[in-house]
From Swiss-Prot:
Gene label: lipA
This protein's name: Lipoyl synthase
PANTHER family: LIPOYL SYNTHASE (PTHR10949), LIPOYL SYNTHASE, MITOCHONDRIAL (PTHR10949:SF0)
Organism of derivation: Neisseria gonorrhoeae (strain ATCC 700825 / FA 1090)
Catalyzed reactions: [[Fe-S] cluster scaffold protein carrying a second [4Fe-4S](2+) cluster] + N(6)-octanoyl-L-lysyl-[protein] + 2 oxidized [2Fe-2S]-[ferredoxin] + 2 S-adenosyl-L-methionine + 4 H(+) = [[Fe-S] cluster scaffold protein] + N(6)-[(R)-dihydrolipoyl]-L-lysyl-[protein] + 4 Fe(3+) + 2 hydrogen sulfide + 2 5'-deoxyadenosine + 2 L-methionine + 2 reduced [2Fe-2S]-[ferredoxin]
Major location category of this protein: cytoplasm
Source species taxonomy: Bacteria, Pseudomonadati, Pseudomonadota, Betaproteobacteria, Neisseriales
Length: 327
């Protein structure tokens, strides 16, 4: 799927932190005094396996969102031999001020990326792979065909590997994107709501809460056997009741799996953390999620969208009568 713009001198320049968020509608104002990080926010130290995987990734010229988004669980996940791959480059066309991925005009798609990704998955011997991407508003299908090409390539070389895709919102391109991803389905379809709709102007400029809900609802209607999943962060200014409202909205749109984790500010140029949710409150959210009918809820301070995704999916795939029919 070809890009809309070609020979652009600004293509490939990546802005991060304050440079990235300088032109969003609501300015990022640092707190006068940062909230102290509580003792329950702890990441595990990396093992030797972590460095082995890093070597494989550099060899294959692959980007993982684990590295690009400065994920706190990178040591633990790499050490278990799992990784979330970010396709279509590491430059995003959006400027969300909670996110540590760079903004700019992305490079052309790499036609070898699906093959390289499949080789990485095979070399790392992954049982479960998560594929995500930057937003590509410069592509006519938002990058859906590239996702499909990556799924096909992995299915060919690692037929027993389960594949979860964590997709952008395909704004303005949803019909074509859903059609493409229904023709080449993953094992789990994930798209994050990120936060409460009242905070979208501040945290997700350019996105729409109802559009994101509709994306997952429509995909579920097209592909009833594929589990759907979404996630949010807490600490951006939402209340506990806001979190409950999001959970109810997810269930009303047939979303089956949920992740909720603590937002951690990547740099002073990003949105500040306005609260640290306690482990006790995360437990309450988890209990309420199961009461609402989610098949799986990964909820806790250090949870990120793909954290323990393999364990989450095993549960959901059992619920969806033993898988999706392509293995």
């Amino acid at each position: 799927m070809s890009e809309i713009k070609t020979d652009d001198p600004k293509r490939g320049i990546k802005l991060r932190g304050a440079d990235k968020t300088a032109r969003i509608p609501i300015k990022v104002v640092p707190l006068q005094e940062k909230l102290k990080k509580p003792e329950w926010i702890r990441a595990k130290l990396p093992s030797r396996k972590f460095f082995e995987i890093k070597d494989i990734l550099r060899e294959q010229k692959m980007h993982t969102v684990c590295e690009e988004a400065s994920c706190p669980n990178i040591g633990e996940c790499f050490s278990k031999g799992t990784a979330t791959f970010m396709i279509m480059g590491d430059i995003c066309t959006r400027r969300c001020p909670f996110c540590d991925v760079g903004h700019g005009r992305p490079n052309m798609l790499d036609p070898d990326e699906p093959k390289n990704l499949a080789e990485s998955v095979k070399a790392m011997n992954l049982r479960y792979v998560v594929i995500t991407s930057v937003d590509r508003d410069d592509l006519r299908d938002g990058g859906a065909q590239h996702f499909a090409d990556c799924i096909k390539a992995i299915r060919e070389t690692s037929p027993n590997t389960k594949i979860e895709i964590l997709v952008p919102d395909f704004r303005g391109r949803l019909d074509i994107a859903l059609k493409i991803l229904a023709e080449t389905p993953p094992d789990v379809m994930n798209h994050n709501l990120e936060t409460h709709p009242s905070l979208y102007r501040k945290a997700r400029p350019g996105a729409n809460y109802q559009h994101s809900l509709d994306l997952l609802k429509r995909y579920k209607e097209m592909m009833p056997h594929i589990p759907t999943k979404s996630g949010i962060m807490v600490g951006l200014g939402e209340t506990d009741e806001d979190v409950r409202e999001i959970m109810r909205d997810m269930r009303a749109h047939n979303i089956e799996m949920i992740t909720i984790g603590q937002y951690l500010q990547p740099s002073d140029g990003h949105l500040p953390v306005l609260r640290y949710v306690t482990p006790e409150q995360f437990k309450i959210f988890e209990k309420e999620a199961y009461e609402l009918g989610f098949t799986n809820a990964a909820i806790g301070a250090m949870v990120r969208s793909s954290y323990h995704a393999d364990e989450q999916a095993a549960e959901a795939l059992r619920e969806s009568h033993g898988g999706c029919g392509h293995h």
